[in-house]
């Protein structure tokens, strides 16, 4: 009887652990914490110290045949701690970069995973898929909610065709209306308590850039240009899109998707020093890099070379 009771208790504990709905991830210092909740969708909260910065943020990925992140069924949880030194081929800020983070990989039924990394200066996440053949990506879901009414520093183009040269506008998240123009990345948010949250992306391959809009409910949602199919002439060094697909990308079914990363700091200088984009980039695949030298570049059309 005692053995039966003990076996039942062990089974209950095992099922509870595997059926866990909330998964916690902390940065190496423990100051930044991400709480990932699995309900009918994938949600996460972000805390720095004792202050919650973002809550009820929703992520997902829609293909022509799959709704990844809707009613997620967890298969496996993999955790990893990494501490390594990176050496840039052409140093831009530092000759060596410390890459230290804790990782949470959630593998779901249906051939997809979501990977979170927590650094001492921010966090990042991305989707990974293990699907057959080519996939049509219809949309990537991101609903971002700041807890406080933050001051946003935005570049707002007239459309998806942009040279990223628009002047920055400064308005609170409550002032940014759904009818206003969308914003491009990076986006910088200043909290009332002086923290800075910079959102951007890295490792874009065979995939469009992310833009942001107000969702009409006080949050921020992702927007993407559709896949161009036909182009026409538009001036001496530009093309205009004549026809678009009904998807945002056609890409390999087995791949990793762009990183969505967030720098968190209370010191503006750390924004300039930050190297998250480099730390999250793919490893260099060029075997011989001796020919790569930093130097000057010529902009022919501008200086009439």
Question: Where in the sequence are the language-model features?
Answer:
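Boundary at the C-terminal end of the N-terminal hydrophobic targeting segment
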Residues: 17-19
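An acidic-aromatic substrate-binding cleft motif
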Residues: 248, 252-305
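N-terminal accessory beta-strand-rich subdomains and adjacent acidic, glycine-rich linkers
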Residues: 22-272
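Sec-dependent N-terminal signal peptides
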Residues: 4-13
């Amino acid at each position: 009887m005692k053995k039966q009771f003990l076996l039942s208790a062990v089974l209950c504990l095992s099922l509870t652990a595997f059926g866990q709905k909330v998964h916690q991830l902390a940065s190496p210092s423990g100051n930044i914490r991400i709480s990932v909740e699995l309900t009918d969708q994938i949600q996460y909260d972000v805390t720095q110290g004792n202050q919650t910065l973002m809550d009820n943020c929703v992520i997902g990925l829609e293909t022509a045949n799959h709704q990844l992140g809707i009613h997620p069924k967890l298969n496996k949880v993999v955790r990893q701690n990494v501490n390594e030194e990176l050496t840039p081929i052409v140093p831009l800020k530092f000759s060596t970069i410390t890459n230290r983070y804790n990782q949470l990989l959630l593998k779901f039924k249906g051939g997809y995973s979501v990977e979170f990394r927590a650094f001492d200066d921010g966090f990042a996440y991305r989707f990974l898929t293990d699907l057959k053949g080519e996939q049509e990506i219809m949309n990537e879901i991101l609903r971002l909610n700041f807890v406080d009414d933050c001051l946003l520093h935005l570049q707002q183009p007239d459309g998806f065709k942009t040279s990223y040269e628009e002047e920055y506008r400064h308005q609170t998240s409550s002032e940014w209306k759904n009818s206003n123009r969308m914003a491009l990345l990076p986006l910088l948010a200043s909290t009332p308590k002086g923290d800075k949250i910079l959102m951007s992306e890295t490792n874009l391959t065979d995939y469009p850039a992310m833009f942001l809009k107000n969702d009409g409910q006080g949050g921020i949602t992702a927007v993407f240009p559709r896949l161009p199919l036909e182009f026409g002439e538009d001036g001496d060094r530009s093309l205009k899109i004549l026809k678009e697909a009904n998807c945002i990308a056609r890409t390999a079914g087995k791949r990793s998707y762009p990183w969505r990363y967030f720098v968190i700091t209370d010191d503006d200088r750390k924004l300039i020093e930050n190297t998250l984009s480099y730390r999250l980039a793919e490893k260099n695949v060029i075997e011989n890099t001796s020919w790569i030298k930093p130097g000057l570049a010529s902009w022919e059309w501008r200086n009439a070379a």
